[in-house]
Amino acid sequence: MKKFLVIVSLFFSFNAFACNDLLDTEMRILDSSETLNLCEYENNVILVVNVASRCGYTYQYASLQKLYERYRENDFVILGVPSRDFMQEYSSEEDVAEFCSTEYGVNFPMF
């Protein structure tokens, strides 16, 4: 019986360390061939933001960056996801990455 309980508890303890299926996703980093598994942020508060560099709300990059800088040490992360759905984003990822870092100093993860 003791052996059975040890095996069962080991089974459940391994599952406790598994990443949530929702986060267990590889995302390609903007303007890079590198990928990042979102399980890295499993214990973080995550804000996913759909962004566009030529949108009327582009100025919000500055506020997002300030928010990220203020709370990132407290397990908070912003994940930026550029969208070309409304033709308000640069056509190349290189241009998007350069714009975000040059104009707004964005250093939160972008995919």
Map each language-model feature to its residues.
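Structural microenvironment flanking redox-active thiols in thiol-disulfide oxidoreductases
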Residues: 57-111
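N-terminal "domain-start" segment that seeds a small globular fold
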Residues: 18-39
